[in-house]
Regions:
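N-terminal entrance/gating region of PLP-dependent enzymes' catalytic architecture
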Residues: 24, 49-139, 145
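Gly-rich Lys/Arg/Thr-decorated short loops/hinges at beta-loop-alpha junctions or inter-strand turns
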Residues: 115-127, 145-150, 178-180, 201-202, ...
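Active-site C-terminal subdomain of aminotransferase-like
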Residues: 288-400
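Conserved PLP-enzyme active-site core in the AAT-like
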Residues: 162-326, 408-411, 415-419
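Charged, compositionally biased N-terminal leader segments and the immediate start
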Residues: 1-24
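Flexible, glycine-rich loop/tail regions that form catalytic "lids" or insertion modules at the edges
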Residues: 8-15, 82, 100-101, 375, ...
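Conserved PLP-binding catalytic core of the aspartate aminotransferase-like
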Residues: 393-421
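Short loop-beta-helix segment that forms the pyridoxal 5′-phosphate
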Residues: 125-129, 133, 146-166
């Protein structure tokens, strides 16, 4: 911030912009000091912090007060922030890799994302009081179970990479009879998912084996060598669509747990993972109306088959009745929670991304099943139109089956193509 002239016009009203954001004004500080029996806020610092830590001034400890320019008025601060932001180069993102541009309906933006009643309580501290929030999370859970065709979903996790690593840990807990501490993952995972899974595996002593799950000659020997689970992206990070059911069948035969990492929007068109043999489904719900936000935060999802209910991380919302016999929402299976299970818990008060799960649920309600399918159809139709145009231009599109991500073989010209796209604003 630059130096600002004091607000002499009196246009900000009785409570200036600075006091709303900086904190207590001088009169407040004086009152606080008198109430607790000190002469000034500086005395609190001198009494609490060792003299060796404070700045020395002529042999005596003193508190150095930073020198700041006068506080800016709201309009001035906004203008300066706009000026700073104008230095950014705004382009259209085509990279994908788990983050996709989406439209947030204005009714959701106004009434949820910009509504402090929703965004201040980012997780239900006293959940049963927040019946409206629990109702929206119930809708979110139903959305996930409907699209994945699995029995139960939690009310969100922190992000897709976290959900994938939590799925790995769930598989290790659930496959107790499997003596092999090996976990198989597809070679074509999103980078952030691979990094988090590998990091979590290293900390917990799990051996992660990367193999091409689309090639039986690659994955079959690894499964036969023993594993407690597998993580199969559907579609994978290259955009390729494939059927993981053969891999899932093989892993089940050795006692392992199967995890499908799915694009939620694509599941409005594709066969659900529950019908392909997945025990667990994970992924991101960012495409359901949540802005990219420079990479996050985004609500992840996890759903599981029957029998894994007590292994799933994240909060579970159920429907019960109150003292008068009326329907009421409450958290269910709380024996998994930290306040009961302590260090053995699979869930705690922050194992969620509630606000953005609410946004995703509202997005699904706003568009309805037909609207979601129409959006997915538009996305994949445009991707196939682009692929056809690229083939007509002489480029080699690597995969015939895809949802919305296209891989192009450029025969050594990738850098030139990248530069031309960047010059064009992409």
């Amino acid at each position: 911030m630059t130096d600002h002239a004091e607000n002499r016009c009196g246009l900000e009203g009785p409570r200036p912009f600075s006091s709303r954001h900086v904190g207590s004004v001088e009169d407040d500080l004086r009152y606080i000091a008198e109430t607790i029996g000190v002469t000034s806020p500086e005395q609190i610092i001198r009494d609490a912090i060792p003299a060796s830590v404070l700045d020395s001034n002529e042999g005596e400890s003193s508190v150095r007060t930073p020198s700041f320019p006068p506080a800016a008025a709201e309009t001035t601060a906004r203008a300066e922030l706009v000026e700073i932001a104008s230095g950014n180069r705004v382009t259209r993102a085509l990279i994908g890799r788990g983050y996709y541009g989406t439209l947030t309906p204005s009714v959701i933006r106004r009434n949820i994302l910009e509504n402090p009643s929703w965004y201040t309580a980012y997780t239900p501290y006293q959940p049963e009081i927040s019946q409206g929030r629990l109702e929206m999370l119930t809708i979110y859970q139903q959305l996930i179970t409907d699209l994945t065709r699995l029995a139960l979903a939690s009310s969100s996790l922190l992000d897709e990479a976290t959900a994938a690593s939590e799925g790995m840990l769930l598989a290790r807990r659930a496959a107790r009879k499997v003596k092999f501490n090996r976990f198989l993952v597809h070679t074509h995972l999103f980078d952030q998912v691979r990094d988090v899974v590998l990091g979590h595996a290293e900390a917990t002593g799990i051996e992660v084996v990367e193999t091409d799950l689309r090639d039986p000659q690659s994955w079959r020997p690894e499964v036969e060598a023993g594993c407690f689970g597998v993580l199969a992206p559907y579609p994978d990070s290259t955009g390729a669509l494939w059927n993981p059911s053969e891999v899932f069948d093989a892993v089940h035969k050795v006692g392992g747990i199967t995890i499908a990492e799915c694009d939620l929007l694509s599941l409005t068109l594709l066969a659900p993972p529950g019908e392909l043999g997945a025990d667990v489904a994970v992924g991101s719900s960012q495409r359901f109306g949540v802005p990219m936000g420079n990479g996050g935060p985004h609500a992840a999802y996890m759903s599981v088959r029957s029998g894994l209910e007590r292994q799933i991380p994240g909060r579970l919302v159920g429907v019960s009745t109150d003292a008068d016999g009326n329907p009421a929402y409450r958290l269910a299976l709380q024996t998994r929670e930290q306040h009961i299970r302590r260090d053995k818990a699979t869930s705690n008060i922050c194992t969620a991304q509630v606000l953005l799960a609410v946004v995703a649920a509202a997005y699904a309600v706003w568009h309805g099943p037909t609207g979601l399918t129409r959006i997915a159809r538009q996305v994949t139709d445009r991707a196939h139109q682009l692929a056809s145009a690229l083939r007509a231009a002489g480029l080699d599109v690597a995969d015939q089956q895809f949802f919305d991500t296209i891989r192009i073989r450029t025969k050594g010209g990738a850098k030139e193509l990248w530069n031309r796209a960047r010059e064009g604003g992409y």
